């Protein structure tokens, strides 16, 4: 009887400790349905305060082909900001050899899809691809976060800010430090593996706390 009771107690504890991980595709998409979660994460990526992100709207995630033989693109999450800038988020758990080519395809398609025939190029707004990787894509350094832009090869001068790629490599996260930047805190949240880790981070960031509440429901 005591052994049966012990087993039942353990099963109850396991159920209470269970939590869906953000690296699971479905969980990540559900997280981004929450406007406050989007606000916090986007602010961290753009280096601003959440209050500065006035509005975010989810867009359809299918990039339709222009011609019958063209390839479709299917994004995880696509968002438009109040200023018209667009961001697409992709959670990629396993390494694939064509990842770089695929994100360039998605980014280019997202940029060109802004215009219809006859519309002015002046209407084009900034497009940002955010790749959240649960594997190491750049093996030659230990930088876990990087922003890639168009720039002059010789001078390093930025050519345009209309296209950006943000790469978050969760496997490269260093040991925790004091006063970490917002994007590093979000990366820790996205890569966490237990309820205990989530709860600890939630105490340090209001928007991460909202994320924990959302995935716990």
Range-by-range predicted roles:
Residues 1-212, 216:
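Elongated, amphipathic alpha-helical interaction scaffolds
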């Amino acid at each position: 009887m005591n052994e049966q009771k012990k087993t039942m107690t353990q099963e109850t504890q396991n159920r209470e400790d269970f939590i869906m991980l953000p690296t699971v595709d479905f969980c990540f998409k559900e997280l981004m349905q929450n406007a406050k979660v989007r606000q916090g994460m986007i602010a961290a990526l753009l280096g601003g305060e959440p209050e500065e992100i006035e509005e975010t709207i989810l867009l359809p995630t299918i990039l339709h082909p222009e011609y019958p033989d063209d390839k479709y693109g299917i994004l995880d999450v696509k968002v438009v900001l109040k200023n018209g800038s667009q961001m697409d988020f992709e959670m990629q758990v396993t390494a694939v050899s064509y990842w770089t080519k695929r994100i360039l395809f998605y980014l280019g398609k997202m940029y060109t899809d802004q215009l219809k025939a006859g519309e002015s190029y002046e209407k084009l707004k900034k497009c940002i691809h955010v790749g959240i990787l649960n594997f190491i894509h750049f093996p030659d350094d230990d930088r876990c976060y990087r922003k890639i832009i168009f720039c002059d090869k010789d001078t390093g001068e930025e050519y345009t800010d209309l296209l950006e790629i943000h790469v978050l490599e969760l496997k490269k996260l260093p040991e925790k430090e004091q006063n970490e930047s917002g994007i590093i805190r979000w990366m820790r949240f996205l890569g966490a593996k237990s309820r205990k880790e989530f709860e600890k981070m939630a105490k340090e960031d209001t928007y991460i706390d909202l994320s924990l509440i959302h995935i716990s429901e």
